[in-house]
């Protein structure tokens, strides 16, 4: 599995806040073939999920009665300055910048629409991520329940994204955040829906979506929406065994013999 070099503003890391970390490990270990590493010291209780040795996601326990959910962090080389700039651009600080020891530094914000978004700077010299392959994130989508224009402008200011309006139909407004012409995330105006909400969602790659979805009930999860054809492939929506919502997207296995470039790879250095 190739490592991708992240550039400022790119999605860098996903975390699962879960009410049952043991159940979550069993669910994703079987579904995505993840291995798990338990950290100690100041990060005791935090679990890193890996695929073929590459870090893919983090898992953290939250109290019973909390909502299990996936969260997204964007890469920044300076968490403090990015946090302060985000607040000036209309965000609300949910977690002040702090050191995570060997995990680097991070902060959490609520964007103008109310969706949680993290900022992260790894402790390593280079920001590397696993993405675009089975068992790794392949796409991110923001549901915007309020303040559509303000939210688009916010991510342009915070992450440096060029915002491309893919559809400006009043009944379906959709935009894509891009860097150097490569799409990083979608943004969907959900304000007209009866139960509109604002949150970031993740699409996880799987090699065979029908096989993956068929496993969900036996693993204690729920198939929220069975596989269907979308613009970028076959996708499905599931709920894991602790209640967290996740999208699945069918993608090809990495083949180094092929000249296959996934969207995040567009920012890797040439040579």
Language model features by range: what are they?
Residues 20-22, 50-55, 72-113, 180, ...:
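Vicinal oxygen chelate
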Residues 1-22, 70-72, 120-152, 158, ...:
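N-terminal beta-strand motif that seeds the catalytic metal site of vicinal oxygen chelate
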Residues 102-104, 116, 126-128:
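Short, well-ordered, mixed-charge alpha-helical segments that flank or form enzyme active sites
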């Amino acid at each position: 599995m190739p490592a991708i070099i992240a550039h400022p503003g790119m999605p860098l890391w996903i975390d699962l806040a879960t009410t049952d970390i043991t159940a979550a490990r069993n669910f994703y270990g079987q579904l995505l073939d993840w291995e798990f590493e338990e950290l100690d010291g100041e990060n005791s209780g935090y679990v890193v999920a890996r695929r073929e040795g590459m870090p893919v996601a983090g898992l953290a326990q939250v109290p019973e009665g909390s909502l299990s959910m996936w969260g997204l962090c964007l890469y920044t080389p300076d968490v403090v300055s990015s946090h302060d700039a985000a607040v000036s651009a209309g965000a609300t600080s949910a977690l002040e910048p702090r050191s995570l020891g060997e995990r680097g530094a991070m902060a959490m914000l609520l964007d103008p629409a109310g969706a949680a978004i993290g900022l992260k700077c790894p402790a390593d010299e280079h920001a590397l991520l696993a993405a675009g392959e089975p068992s790794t994130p392949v796409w991110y989508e923001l549901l915007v329940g309020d303040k559509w224009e303000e939210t688009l402008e916010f991510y342009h200011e915070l992450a440096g994204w060029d915002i491309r309006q893919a559809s400006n139909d009043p009944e379906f407004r959709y935009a894509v955040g891009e860097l150097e012409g490569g799409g990083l995330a979608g943004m969907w105006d959900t304000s007209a829906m009866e139960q509109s909400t604002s949150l970031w969602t993740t699409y996880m790659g799987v090699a065979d979506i029908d096989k993956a979805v068929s496993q969900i009930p036996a693993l204690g999860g729920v198939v929220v929406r069975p596989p269907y054809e979308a613009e970028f492939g076959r996708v499905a929506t599931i709920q894991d065994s602790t209640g967290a919502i996740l999208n699945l997207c069918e993608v090809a296995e990495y083949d180094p013999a092929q000249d296959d470039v996934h969207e995040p790879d567009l920012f890797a250095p040439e040579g």
